[in-house]
């Protein structure tokens, strides 16, 4: 909690494509069942600081309603063998200030023994409703949400801003990371 207070007490050195808080995305009018789990945010102070965090050149800072998002994602159940997976629609922020709608379904990537040992980690896959070749992979853990969107223009990343802060996320193009920078999972 002290970390969150200190982060929210400082001003953004955030370099976004859009500096104002966003209205609910217009795309949700077409897909109202997706709900709104992400909102642009502005943090005030001299800088955003999180020990060990490497910031991309451009990014979008978002506030995530993580408890609601987690509940929504966990409402989709893994299919029984031979059955088609349940799917849900999820509005996912993009670095350019927009939202994409993705059809999300649970996916198994961990060995059964690991999945049984860590039931709080869930993984999902999906595709863009508008651009079916665009794929998303995402996971939820007690530490927050991470995602990678594979587009024809490169990868888009979604990461918690700081370890232990699940409701503040960065959305950015992987190409905007400094040369040689490693993702949090690569360290």
Q: What do these predicted regions represent?
A:
Residues 14-187:
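Zymogen propeptides/activation segments of proteases
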Residues 2-9:
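Bacterial N-terminal signal peptides
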């Amino acid at each position: 909690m002290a970390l969150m207070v200190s982060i929210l007490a400082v001003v953004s050195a955030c370099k976004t494509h859009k500096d104002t808080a966003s209205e609910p995305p217009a795309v949700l009018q077409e897909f109202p069942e997706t709900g709104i789990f992400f909102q642009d945010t502005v943090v005030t102070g001299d800088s955003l600081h999180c020990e060990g965090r490497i910031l991309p050149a451009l990014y979008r800072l978002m506030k995530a309603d993580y408890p609601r998002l987690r509940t929504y994602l966990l409402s989709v159940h893994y299919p029984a063998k031979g059955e088609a997976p349940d799917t849900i629609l999820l509005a996912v922020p993009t670095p350019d200030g927009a939202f994409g709608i993705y059809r999300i379904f649970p996916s198994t990537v961990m060995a059964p023994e690991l999945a049984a040992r860590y039931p709080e980690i869930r993984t999902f896959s999906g595709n863009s409703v508008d651009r079916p070749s665009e794929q998303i992979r995402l996971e939820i853990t007690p530490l927050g949400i991470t995602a990678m969107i594979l587009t024809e223009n490169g990868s888009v990343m979604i990461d918690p801003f700081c370890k232990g802060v699940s409701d503040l996320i960065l959305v950015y193009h992987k190409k905007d990371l400094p040369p040689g920078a490693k993702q949090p999972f690569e360290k």
